[in-house]
From Swiss-Prot:
One of the primary rRNA binding proteins, it binds directly to 16S rRNA where it nucleates assembly of the head domain of the 30S subunit. Is located at the subunit interface close to the decoding center, probably blocks exit of the E-site tRNA. It comes from Mycobacteroides abscessus (strain ATCC 19977 / DSM 44196 / CCUG 20993 / CIP 104536 / JCM 13569 / NCTC 13031 / TMC 1543 / L948). The gene is rpsG. This is Small ribosomal subunit protein uS7. The keyword Ribosomal protein applies. Part of the 30S ribosomal subunit. Contacts proteins S9 and S11.
């Protein structure tokens, strides 16, 4: 266990193209093997495709998708006596953003379109319309929290 405490969080720079921290976070989530230029190409291409298909600002579309994917509740394991309970807890805003971005990228990679640009663009568009696997993941998370509501008094 480190004695210094948690590492301080560094400030995120705004994205050079769209001027948005959210786009910077998305680029960092798409990033594989340190190849940032490729990650930027994928994200910018996906946002351009989203602009072409909707005719609106892609950052607004991305924010709408994020609002539809961000979880409000999740379950965490808590051991009480000999039993492990799934205790529903509220999700902190920074964690909900991180989870939403992670789910968007993960389910984009699992899609069947030909290129990652198309996959990410279509997942963002689906999520902004309340469809897609990432929105389903959020609903499943909320259902799980609702089903385990009886254990909410074990919150810490």
């Amino acid at each position: 266990m480190p004695r210094k405490g948690p590492a301080p969080s560094r400030p995120l720079v705004n994205d050079p193209v769209y001027g948005s921290q959210l786009v910077t976070q998305l680029v960092n989530k798409v990033l594989l093997d340190g190849k940032k230029s490729i990650a930027e190409r994928i994200v910018y291409g996906a946002l351009e495709q989203a602009r072409d298909k909707t005719g609106t600002d892609p950052v607004v579309t991305l924010k709408r998708a994020m609002d539809n994917v961000k979880p409000a509740l999740e379950v965490r394991s808590r051991r009480v006596g000999g039993a492990t309970y799934q205790v529903p807890v509220e999700v902190r805003p920074d964690r909900s953003t991180t989870l939403a971005l992670r789910w968007l990228v993960t389910f984009s990679r699992a899609r069947r379109e030909k290129t990652m640009v198309e996959r990410l663009a279509n997942e963002i568009l689906d999520a902004s319309n309340g469809l897609g696997a990432s929105v389903k993941r959020r609903e499943d998370t909320h259902k799980m929290a609702e089903a385990n509501r009886a254990f909410a008094h074990y919150r810490w």
